[in-house]
């Protein structure tokens, strides 16, 4: 079977090589690039992200990444956001009282977690539903690796989206599956066999 082609979008943020290796281990043919044509042509596009929301959006817009994402989603082409790469898919992020416009693929805001210990760092379970493709075949007690201080803590998007939740004091979105657009707040590339299973499930949809 021919390997699925995946572009990891290089806009100056994210664990690019870790993501590349994790995707290659589950059978994808991976290119790390900022090239719009390559990103448009690939079977799947991964949008990583670490650090500040505003800095990520600045880097993304600099390479036209917001347009690349929008065009792929409009055409029904799969996109996977990871960590801050998930957060920037929402309409806005609020950090230190500064509001930054995101890609706007989903309505709503990314805000600081309301917990005494920040960042939320370490392994945590998630609550996925029976309709999830990303978590297919995984047990309910499976843990994933998180490191973040901000998250989407409510959902204002399509009622048909498949939502997966986790908790750090209060609930937050751990993953969203919404047509061609999927995202995880945790790092699948740092989540061992569980993360590999999520990536494999995503690639099998391409």
UniProtKB/Swiss-Prot annotation:
Matching entries from InterPro entries are given as: Class_I_gatase-like, GATASE, Imidazole-glycPsynth_HisH
Q: Which GO terms describe its biological process?
A: L-histidine biosynthetic process
Task of the protein: IGPS catalyzes the conversion of PRFAR and glutamine to IGP, AICAR and glutamate. The HisH subunit catalyzes the hydrolysis of glutamine to glutamate and ammonia as part of the synthesis of IGP and AICAR. The resulting ammonia molecule is channeled to the active site of HisF.
Its subcellular locations are:
Cytoplasm
State its Enzyme Commission number(s): 4.3.2.10, 3.5.1.2
Annotated keywords: Amino-acid biosynthesis, Cytoplasm, Glutamine amidotransferase, Histidine biosynthesis, Hydrolase, Lyase
A GO molecular-function descriptor: lyase activity
Gene name in the database record: hisH
Q: Where is the Glutamine amidotransferase type-1 domain?
A: 5-206
Q: Write down what this protein is called.
A: Imidazole glycerol phosphate synthase subunit HisH
Q: Which residues form a coiled coil?
A: none
Q: Which SUPFAM superfamilies match?
A: Class I glutamine amidotransferase-like
Gene3D superfamilies, A to Z: 3.40.50.880
Catalytic residues per the record? 83 (nucleophile), 187, 189
Principal subcellular localization: cytoplasm
